[in-house]
């Protein structure tokens, strides 16, 4: 009989649930829904990943519906997934607020009546797609007052992250590098500072290109990662989705386990005391 192995109770029980506001989730990998080869590829990748939270661009979903086309929203089982509507494409705070309200209508039609989540994106920069810190702060404050669970996408700015936490944001979502670039962890020091200072979940969003990069930020103490292009543009999206899932889980376990101290000198693996010469 093979020996069985189970994780310590503190890893797999309620103490390590990923919580946003008053909702708990079992997976710390969140997925985007754009850039897939086709609709079925997206659905299969999401299913393989084990992700609980899937983000959908409100504008794209609305435009697809208006054109009478089948979209990803119609193809997913929303009794098993939590939709995170986002304000992608909004260039101002005012526009983001308006689109967020439209997103609430879509969410309610899917039967998630207690879902007030919004991924806030205010991006006037069309070249590098860098978020507007002032517009984000302005829109976040308004949406929080309206009862939204606000999850702002931001640059890797520790001061802004703390300001957003202080006004009541449920999470902060700093970028690792520009959206869709696959450049990886270009702001690692700032991400470390944000994670260290935060009392709310820190979700690393944008720029992650490989599972090792996802695992690295989880090792540092990030609460979760959101991945889209790295999976959607992989040669085999389903395999990459599985790899990302394993990396996120591995990184989280590493963080909980605690890394060994780094030593300047070598230390023998086996004790030499008592060994005869």
Curated annotation (Swiss-Prot):
Major place of residence: plastid
> Any one Gene Ontology biological process term?
thiamine diphosphate biosynthetic process
Q: Which Pfam families match?
A: ThiG
- Please give the Gene Ontology molecular function terms for this protein: thiazole synthase activity
Lineage top rank: taxon: Eukaryota
Enumerate the UniProt keywords alphabetically.
Chloroplast, Plastid, Schiff base, Thiamine biosynthesis, Transferase
Q: In which pathway does it act?
A: Cofactor biosynthesis; thiamine diphosphate biosynthesis
Locate the active site: 119 (schiff-base intermediate with dxp)
Q: Where in the cell is it found?
A: Plastid, Chloroplast
Reaction(s) catalysed (UniProt annotation): [ThiS sulfur-carrier protein]-C-terminal-Gly-aminoethanethioate + 2-iminoacetate + 1-deoxy-D-xylulose 5-phosphate = [ThiS sulfur-carrier protein]-C-terminal Gly-Gly + 2-[(2R,5Z)-2-carboxy-4-methylthiazol-5(2H)-ylidene]ethyl phosphate + 2 H2O + H(+)
Instruction: Specify which residues bind 1-deoxy-D-xylulose 5-phosphate according to the UniProt entry for this protein.
Output: 180, 206-207, 228-229
Q: Which GO terms describe its cellular component?
A: chloroplast
Q: Does the keyword Phosphoprotein belong to this entry?
A: no
InterPro entries the UniProt entry points to = Aldolase_TIM, Thiazole_synthase_ThiG, ThiG
Which spans are transmembrane here? none
Q: What is its EC number?
A: 2.8.1.10
| Subunit details | Homotetramer. Forms heterodimers with either ThiH or ThiS.
Q: Its family?
A: Belongs to the ThiG family.
Function of the molecule: Catalyzes the rearrangement of 1-deoxy-D-xylulose 5-phosphate (DXP) to produce the thiazole phosphate moiety of thiamine. Sulfur is provided by the thiocarboxylate moiety of the carrier protein ThiS. In vitro, sulfur can be provided by H(2)S.
Q: What is the protein named? A: Thiazole synthase
* Species in which this protein is naturally found: Porphyra purpurea
Starting at the broadest rank, the lineage of the source organism is: Eukaryota, Rhodophyta, Bangiophyceae, Bangiales, Bangiaceae
What is the gene called? thiG
